[in-house]
Amino acid sequence: MKTINSVDTKEFLNHQVANLNVFTVKIHQIHWYMRGHNFFTLHEKMDDLYSEFGEQMDEVAERLLAIGGSPFSTLKEFLENASVEEAPYTKPKTMDQLMEDLVGTLELLRDEYQQGIELTDKEGDNVTNDMLIAFKASIDKHIWMFKAFLGKAPLE
């Protein structure tokens, strides 16, 4: 049995633990601060996203532990190591602005997951690779759906 000792994979996964923690806070902010048309539909959708990405974060952290890593576990570590940025909502935003922000973060995660897929494929870490492929597929679908909500094509 091959042992996964890649520092690169461990660093990548830890970076995603940080990203996913910051992202779940952003989803919660959208959930709390959304107003206007489509409120009921999108408010419920944010509940679903919050759960999904919370589960992703847990799976990534547990995979990191399984390969001998140590996931970040403090707010300070999350903020210092995430490429997903905090986004304080200090003034009201339209539903479209909130969804554009959400799509931007989803696209960042999608692109980083693609890098992780390539890294883990090169290293022969099939378990992590499969996990990232599944997560990326879900993100691709969310991007398509939210862009459709915004009246845009998926690759626009």
Curated annotation (Swiss-Prot):
Catalysed reaction, written as an equation: 2 Fe(2+) + H2O2 + 2 H(+) = 2 Fe(3+) + 2 H2O
GO molecular function: ferric iron binding; oxidoreductase activity, acting on metal ions
Induction description: By iron limitation and stationary growth phase.
SUPFAM superfamilies (UniProt xref): Ferritin-like (SSF47240)
Record carries keyword Iron: yes
Amino acids binding Fe cation 2: 62
EC numbers, comma separated: 1.16.-.-
Matching Pfam families: Ferritin
Keywords: Cytoplasm, Iron, Iron storage, Metal-binding, Oxidoreductase, Virulence
An example Gene Ontology biological process: intracellular iron ion homeostasis
Keyword Metal-binding: yes
InterPro entries: DPS_DNA-bd, DPS_DNA-bd_CS, Ferritin-like, Ferritin-like_SF, Ferritin_DPS_dom
UniProt binding sites for Fe cation 1: 31, 58, 62
UniProt subcellular location: Cytoplasm
A cellular component term, taken from the record's GO annotations: cytoplasm
Family: Belongs to the Dps family.
Domain comment in the entry: 12 di-nuclear ferroxidase centers are located at the interfaces between subunits related by 2-fold symmetry axes.
Quaternary structure and partners: Homododecamer. The 12 subunits form a hollow sphere into which the mineral iron core of up to 500 Fe(3+) can be deposited.
Functional summary from the UniProt entry: Protects DNA from oxidative damage by sequestering intracellular Fe(2+) ion and storing it in the form of Fe(3+) oxyhydroxide mineral. One hydrogen peroxide oxidizes two Fe(2+) ions, which prevents hydroxyl radical production by the Fenton reaction. Does not bind to DNA. Dps is important for full resistance to heat and cold shocks and is essential for full virulence of this bacterium. It seems to play a direct or indirect role on the production and/or stability of listeriolysin O.
Name of the protein described by the UniProt record: DNA protection during starvation protein
Native organism: Listeria monocytogenes serovar 1/2a (strain ATCC BAA-679 / EGD-e)
